[in-house]
Design a protein with these regions (language model features):
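A solvent-exposed interaction/effector surface
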Residues: 193, 197, 201-387
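C-terminal and inter-domain tail/linker signature
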Residues: 2-208
Length: 387
């Protein structure tokens, strides 16, 4: 779908703008580098420029501690990590030869194993990486926050896996190189290697949801927990009319008619997904049904609707919490999902606003219930990745 995240210093390679981690989750048993040396494609050597940089900030191979400017290493990460999965690759000379890497299901103790793992992920998962921030969190420690989107290319339906979290990177004070890299996922509690909870988190993301291959509103994934996802949506335009209930379809033919040519210029406009129904306030509040218009469309150039009850509306960008589910989106199911989501958000100290949206990505009349993709979205009053 989409995009990934938002930051004053940000790196983004995303399949959805999407959207869209410092280090990445891996789904392979660690392979000793002695048997599988890293391919040349990921052995790019930038030692000369990196050595000059290190000398500039006081790094040395001597046994005495150098004068450390960790802030410059933070700046280096902002420059280097965007290349995690491109042809340039990360600067391997920034890491000790013996570097400890660990995430909940992967473990390496050398730069060779670490780089080979990155290579495998690049080939099989086509990852999209976004660094939200990096900052010093200890005398010889930098913490980063990231989002990682991965498309598992070996399965026919190519599921998208989403991971968010932090990486704690330890610095060798003698060399000013990174000597450890420990990943912590937001979606699990047990982040120690080997975490069966982490493995299950991977497996459950492999399930099949039928998502049409058409345009969707652009968003960034800021955080994914065990119970919900936090997204930042870009602004978009909808054609909307009054609906009957959150799970209802009343009014759909009216808004669909607009994009099929029932407008002042008889223009046919491309269909998008999902179809939104929006409830304002509690169950007794008003309901609107909306079709999102393609991102290339501008409000000033759109044709007027033929039907007076159809309205064109600009929707401001927003940060929302989202829960995904399959099956038929009946009113009881949708309200139950909304209630559960509010409970999880409040338990995590977030402030959900009144009202919610139901996003339906498929035609329920022509799609098997167990592969339907439905989502409930609730706007968040305030959200910060610094919290």
């Amino acid at each position: 779908m989409k995009s990934i995240g938002n930051s004053s210093k940000m790196a983004s390679h995303s399949p959805h703008s999407l959207l869209h981690t410092n280090r990445l989750p891996s789904f392979f048993v660690p392979v000793p580098a002695v048997f599988f040396p890293p391919p040349n494609i990921i052995q790019r050597n930038f030692a000369a420029p990196f050595t000059l940089r290190m000398k500039a900030i006081g790094a040395t191979n001597a046994t005495s501690s150098p004068s450390v400017d960790v802030n410059q290493l933070v700046d280096f990460l902002y420059e280097d990590l965007p290349h995690l999965f491109d042809d340039q690759g990360i600067n391997r000379s920034a890491y000790d030869d013996k570097v400890e890497f660990r995430d909940p299901i992967t473990k390496h103790d050398s730069i060779g194993g670490y780089l080979f793992n990155i290579f495998l992920l690049k080939i099989i998962f086509r990852p999209a990486f976004q660094l939200h921030w990096a900052k010093q969190t200890g005398p010889y420690e930098i913490t980063t926050r990231w989002t990682m989107l991965m498309t598992f290319l070996l399965l026919p339906w190519k599921p998208q896996l989403v991971f968010t979290g932090t990486s704690v990177m330890g610095i060798n004070p003698k060399t000013m190189k990174f000597r450890s890299h420990l990943d912590y996922w937001d979606s699990i509690k047990n982040n120690k290697y080997f975490s069966f909870e982490g493995l299950l988190d991977v497996i459950k993301q492999l399930r099949f949801y039928k998502t049409p291959d058409i345009e969707t509103p652009r968003y960034s994934v800021l955080k994914r927990t065990a119970n919900y996802e936090i997204r930042k949506y870009d602004p978009y335009i909808v054609v909307e009319t009054t609906g009957d209930k959150l799970s209802g379809s009343s009014g759909f033919n009216d808004v669909a008619g607009y994009i099929f040519g029932k407008n002042s210029t008889m223009e046919k406009i491309a269909m998008t997904t999902p179809v939104f129904t929006e409830a304002i306030g509690d169950e007794s509040g008003d309901v609107a049904i909306q079709i999102v218009l393609p991102a290339e469309k501008k409000m000033e150039s759109l044709p007027a609707p033929d039907l007076e009850k159809n309205k064109l509306k600009s929707v401001m960008g927003a940060i929302v919490a989202v829960v995904k589910f399959s099956g038929k989106a009946t009113e009881d199911v949708v309200r139950d999902k909304e209630g559960q989501l509010r409970k999880f958000l409040l338990a995590d100290g977030l402030r959900p606003l009144d009202g919610c949206q139901l996003a339906r990505y498929n035609d329920p009349g022509s799609t098997w219930p167990f592969v339907l993709r439905n989502e409930v979205l609730i706007k968040i009053d305030h959200f910060s990745l610094e919290d």
